[in-house]
């Protein structure tokens, strides 16, 4: 019986450590969400080495992804769970500016933290083409 009480107490303590202040009583998973964009050229080939900047339109703040480099050529992280404290649960506009050499494109996104834990894309393109 004593072992069972200790086990239950340990589980409750572990779960309490995962609770998110913006979601009273809620538990966040250990997953780490990232919103990505694939950048292609006029021939629909992946573009590597592009400069990608995501800006939170409401504040003008640059959102810096905390994820490591992605291993898919032409795919870039825009926003990840490292920015959940900046994004409204109901959603925020994010503008992505992407360039390489003389070519550039901007794309508009809406991202949210609807569950109080993880970034999710409400709208915006999966792929953009440099022009």
Kindly give the residue locations of the regions a language model identified.
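Short beta-strand/loop motifs in extracellular/secreted proteins, especially
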Residues: 35, 48-52, 92-94
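Solvent-exposed serine/threonine-rich low-complexity stretches and specific carbohydrate-binding patches
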Residues: 62-74, 110-113
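Short Pro-Gly-centered beta-turn/loop motif in secreted/extracellular proteins
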Residues: 69-93
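Short, ordered, surface-exposed loop/turn motifs in non-cytosolic proteins
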Residues: 43-69
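Sec-dependent bacterial lipoprotein signal peptides
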Residues: 1-18
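Beta-strand-rich domain onsets/edges
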Residues: 18-34, 40-43, 119-131
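Structured interaction patches on ligand/partner-binding surfaces of diverse proteins
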Residues: 98-124
């Amino acid at each position: 019986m004593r072992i069972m009480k200790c086990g239950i107490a340990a589980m409750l303590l572990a779960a309490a450590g995962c609770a998110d202040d913006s979601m009273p009583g809620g538990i966040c998973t250990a997953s780490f969400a990232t919103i990505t964009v694939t950048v292609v050229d006029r021939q629909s080939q992946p573009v590597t080495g592009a400069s990608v900047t995501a800006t939170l339109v409401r504040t003008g703040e640059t959102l810096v992804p905390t994820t490591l480099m992605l291993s898919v050529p032409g795919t870039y992280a825009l926003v990840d769970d490292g920015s959940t404290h900046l994004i409204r649960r109901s959603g925020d506009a994010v503008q992505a500016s992407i360039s390489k050499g003389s070519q550039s494109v901007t794309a508009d996104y809406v991202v949210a933290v609807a569950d109080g834990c993880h970034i999710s894309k409400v709208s915006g393109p999966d792929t953009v083409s440099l022009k």
